[in-house]
């Protein structure tokens, strides 16, 4: 590394340290109506089918996906 490399890097990052970081203005209200059992069941089932079912299929059929040696 060159002798000037730390000076160049310090010059590049020095101005970024002085920039103010804006805070997010997130305000939320309470829900208008509570979720029922049916909505929760449909939501959890759709998450399971979307994410876990394909991963389980691939893991259970891993031997068929491997290349023959």
UniProtKB/Swiss-Prot annotation:
It holds the Pfam family COX8. Residues 26-36 are mitochondrial matrix. Pathway: Energy metabolism; oxidative phosphorylation. Coiled coil: none annotated. Component of the cytochrome c oxidase (complex IV, CIV), a multisubunit enzyme composed of 14 subunits. The complex is composed of a catalytic core of 3 subunits MT-CO1, MT-CO2 and MT-CO3, encoded in the mitochondrial DNA, and 11 supernumerary subunits COX4I, COX5A, COX5B, COX6A, COX6B, COX6C, COX7A, COX7B, COX7C, COX8 and NDUFA4, which are encoded in the nuclear genome. Belongs to the cytochrome c oxidase VIII family. A motif (SIFI-degron) lies at residues 2-19. Keywords: Membrane, Mitochondrion, Mitochondrion inner membrane, Transit peptide, Transmembrane, Transmembrane helix, Ubl conjugation. PANTHER family: CYTOCHROME C OXIDASE POLYPEPTIDE VIII, CYTOCHROME C OXIDASE SUBUNIT 8A, MITOCHONDRIAL. The keyword Transit peptide applies. It comes from the Eukaryota. One of its GO terms (biological process) is mitochondrial electron transport, cytochrome c to oxygen. The keyword Transmembrane helix applies. This is Cytochrome c oxidase subunit 8A, mitochondrial. Component of the cytochrome c oxidase, the last enzyme in the mitochondrial electron transport chain which drives oxidative phosphorylation. The respiratory chain contains 3 multisubunit complexes succinate dehydrogenase (complex II, CII), ubiquinol-cytochrome c oxidoreductase (cytochrome b-c1 complex, complex III, CIII) and cytochrome c oxidase (complex IV, CIV), that cooperate to transfer electrons derived from NADH and succinate to molecular oxygen, creating an electrochemical gradient over the inner membrane that drives transmembrane transport and the ATP synthase. It is a single-pass membrane protein. Residues 61-69 are mitochondrial intermembrane.
């Amino acid at each position: 590394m060159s002798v000037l490399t730390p000076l160049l890097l310090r010059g590049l990052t020095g101005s970024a340290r002085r920039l103010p970081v804006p805070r997010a203005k997130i305000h939320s209200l309470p829900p208008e109506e509570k979720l029922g059992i049916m909505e929760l069941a449909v939501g959890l089932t759709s998450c399971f089918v979307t994410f876990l079912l394909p991963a389980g299929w691939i893991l259970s059929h891993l031997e068929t996906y491997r290349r023959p040696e």
